[in-house]
Amino acid sequence: MSDSEEEIKQNTDPVDNAWSLKIPAFRQEDNPHGMVEESSFATLFPKYREKYLREVWPLVEQCVAEHQLKAELDLVEGSMVVKTTRKTWDPYIIIKSRDMIKLMARSVPFEQAKRVLQDDIGCDIIKIGNLVHKKEKFVKRRQRLIGPNGATLKSIELLTDCYVLVQGNTVSALGPYKGLQQVRDIVLETMNNVHPIYNIKALMIKRELMKDPKLANEDWSRFLPKFKNKNISKRKQPKSKKPKKEYTPFPPAQPESKIDKQLASGEYFLNQEQKQAKRNQERSAKQADAAKKQDERRNKDFVPPTEEAPSRKRQAEDSSKVDVKALKAKLVKANKKSKS
């Protein structure tokens, strides 16, 4: 059995942890004839990155030349281009180099961006601009992701082994593929108003649990922190709510018109003089009613208030109460007068 067959047999065995598998290296012997057609990718960069890119571009050309690629910098158009050559033997390196210039256009330094050319390193550009509608909320949640003095961002980098850069409406991440998955989950949940400290705590707990072989096949959910949403609706409730009418499949009855009301009361059949006489009668009745109410309002001040008559029970209580001391003093006084 040859070495290649043994490698294939080893790869087909069951794997407990898929993340532990190493990506097989692609060597030049695997593609000795090179590339038939030229492939190229271009990306634009902002004006403020022009000075930095001009300084590091010789290093970029030297880096891509190791993989038989060609890089061009167009300062007039503001674009970076990477191309394959006839000597390029790795078909996927052009995709990796495209990711590198994308990261450099998004303010990632060249020293970090060139790591994406490695086989076990990938990148992820997460768009967060359209996840929050209000600008104030977006800025607040983005700052929450960075943390005070960049502490939150640094802890995310240490736990995921990724380089993370928050720039404008995007978050650029660079590192191993498992770490990129964790970074994307943290960023998206942070923009959905879940504080990143919960996910950071969960990652720290998982890292400690992975060290214990006894807990390898157990559920870890009981160890992880549980987040409870405490958002309360801030909409002011009306003081008096109108009760909803019961639903009926039939449309409401048509309201009576003025002519219908006149027909019902018989006014429709009266002539002009009779209608005028009826209106005068109604007017005089209203005036008499208003005059009566006005007289009652004027005479209200002259009406004496009603006084409560003393009840018999209260009178009996007053008569039953006798002041003994006052009676004694009265008798002593009367005796003195009689002696004198």
From Swiss-Prot:
Classification via SUPFAM superfamilies: Eukaryotic type KH-domain (KH-domain type I)
Coiled coil start-end: 269-302
Chain's role: Required for 40S ribosome biogenesis. Involved in nucleolar processing of pre-18S ribosomal RNA and ribosome assembly. Binds to RNA. Required for female germline development, cell viability during eye development and for survival of dividing cells and epithelial cells during early wing disk development.
Name of this chain's protein: KRR1 small subunit processome component homolog
Keywords carried by this UniProt record: Coiled coil, Developmental protein, Nucleus, Ribonucleoprotein, Ribosome biogenesis, RNA-binding, rRNA processing
Biased composition (Basic and acidic residues): 275-301, 309-324
Taxonomy, superkingdom: Eukaryota
Assembly and binders: Monomer. Component of the ribosomal small subunit (SSU) processome.
One annotated Gene Ontology cellular component of this protein: small-subunit processome
Keyword Ribosomal protein attributed: no
GO biological process: rRNA processing
Localization per record: Nucleus, Nucleolus
InterPro entries for the chain: KH_dom (IPR004087), KH_dom_type_1_sf (IPR036612), KRR1-like_KH1 (IPR041174), KRR1-like_KH1_euk (IPR048550), KRR1-like_KH2 (IPR048548), KRR1-like_KH2_euk (IPR048549), rRNA_assembly_KRR1 (IPR024166)
